[in-house]
Amino acid sequence: MKKNIIVGSLIAAVVSQISAAAFPDVRSEIQDGDASLQGPIALAFENVVKNHVLRQDPVYLSECFKDRTEVDFWQTEFWGKYMHSAAPFWSITKCSQLKPRIDAGFENVVSAQLENGYIGNYIESRRSAPGGWDVWGIKYTMLGLLHYYDIEKASNPERAKRAIDTCKRLCDYLIKTAGPGAKYTIAKTGNYSGQPSCSNLEPVMWLYNRTKEQKYLDFAKFIVSQMTEDENGPRLLDLAQKGVPVADRSVLPKRNSIWSGVRTNRGKAYEMMSCYQGLIEYYEVTGRKDLLDAAVWSAKNIIQEEINLAGSGASYEHWYHGAKHQHEPFMHTQETCVTITWMRLCEKLLSITGDSVWADQFEKTFYNAYLASMHRDGKLFAVYTPLDGTRSEGQIHCRMHTNCCNANGPRGFLSFIRSILQSKGDEVFLNYFVSSRASIKIPVLGKKAAFEMHTHYPKLGEVDVRFRIQEPMKFKFSMRIPACVKVAKFKVNGEFVTSGIPENGGYVTLERTWNPGDAVVVDFELPVKMHRIDDSIAFTRGPVLLARDSRFCDGDVGAVMRVDDIEKMFADGKTMDFPVEAFSNQDDMRMVVSARLPVGGHDENRDRRAFATVKFCDYASAGNLWSPSNYYRVWFPLSHNPAKLMK
């Protein structure tokens, strides 16, 4: 990570480059309730709370725990996933309608716990056994109980104790049935070489951090050994140390379906990242840096070989070297659970490493793949969100009126809101640019600093940050400069800062005594960059992927672009400016830009050779009518020159 320190007077200061420690102390995030959004992102969040979370019935989602006849499905994840967002959202919004629903769901879950501690819906012979999703469901049930504990511990200690005691009994059951000495240890249960089951490491670490009971850390250590030492297990450590790409960690049988080899496959994207999330939690307590290094290496491999221009990846939820295939029509791409888990992993790695690359990745995913997965009124989340075609609701899962991605979808907003600001020592980090008011505690000072931000980013480049502190405070203020933008202007209290700003992403750190009303104003240029794979091209503007949409009625959204002209326009990495413009259906689209481009292949006809005006919207807005008549595309074919075929 590159940082620039500006000390004392901002105009006369000497700016120096420093390198952050490889893995510095963990940054703190915004506490739930200490941030409020404004503008279009606030509207999207409000729609999710109002039209999705409030319309879920947690009693219905948890009723499956009382019908213990399952042998294969995963419906026991739904209540825990609901709580993964609903409980923190209540802390953020204090919505009076939400809390009673959360309480009712909690009571239903507690009432379903068996005497031996089990909460689930599997028949006894299939519990903690090979195949199925029983142990995976326990993971989400523990997470849900711990979220409930977190929102009750300050105001209702009795309920908080019931939540933590219920979670402890469930974890004790898991230790007995899948821990040391069990018939099937945890990596032998479930599917995908035990990855789904071993991802229980995250809630086990949460439970240890809240209780400090050694038996839970001991169980976490056992799960880590199962993840890393079992030859037939997930092998999340040695395969990373050997440099094996995430897509190449499985030995699969010959197959016509990606689901073949479901018991032994190690390439399941969602579950692999969930395991690394747990390993990072374990590193925070034990200091086992080899585990963190494996997580970082694997995440960087995901960036290099899997993540597409929309910030997500996977086909049929499996890694497949997808970055180089993203222009091709692979089936079932970009599952929303994969998208959200990637966001959570980036959020965690940002707080641990301080490396701005994780914020860059998170931002790209949030503004593209994540927002694209959401119905524009927030009521639904898609299961898959392709890079071209149309958008639609996913199928129902497990004989219930929901699915895994609908249950998981709202969680992405929580990661975004919590990590707008982070702090460590005497430093505040501004990671994301969204109109908002937020405060965060500065550990060294023991006080909170409040900020107000106004911006239309990423549609427009200006970001205005006001310091809403109550008294002068001396601390470092580090502002992220995204790698995908250029800084046109950087001002502090009206005075220009002209040096020390990283060109390829990083943080600018301003160290001084801040006064109430101080202002940092930055104007980013948002260059349009062309991306090419084989004979297909796509365009990004800043962090936003651009798409043609049928609502523009400006021709075939998949029209060929003339290769010779395009190559001249973007020669040697040149970027362009696609100006923002108004559109009659502006409420449907967050951003519309246009450009004169060489569309069509009839270069022998002067009129057809002329460049045409082409409109683009942000990928997240493309196809958001969720109608078969509203189609879109982000990758465009180039015309071919037969000369390249000649020897």
Predicted regions, residues:
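Positively charged n-region of N-terminal signal peptides that target proteins for export
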Residues: M1-N4
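Bacterial N-terminal signal peptides
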Residues: G8-Q17
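Aromatic (Trp/Tyr) and acidic
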Residues: A21-S96, P100, S128-P157, S197-K215, ...
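C-terminal beta-rich recognition modules with glycine/proline-rich loops and embedded aromatic residues
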Residues: V49, A220, A295, A359-N368, ...
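Helix-terminus loop motifs that line ligand-binding clefts
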Residues: Y82, S96-V135, E306-S315
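Asp-box/WD-like beta-propeller blade repeats and closely related beta-sheet repeat scaffolds
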Residues: E124-V135, M142, A160-Q195
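Solenoidal tandem-repeat scaffolds enriched in leucines and small polar residues
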Residues: A178-L237, Q241-V246, V262
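Solvent-exposed beta-strand/loop surfaces of large extracellular or lumenal domains
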Residues: V485-R512, M530-D534
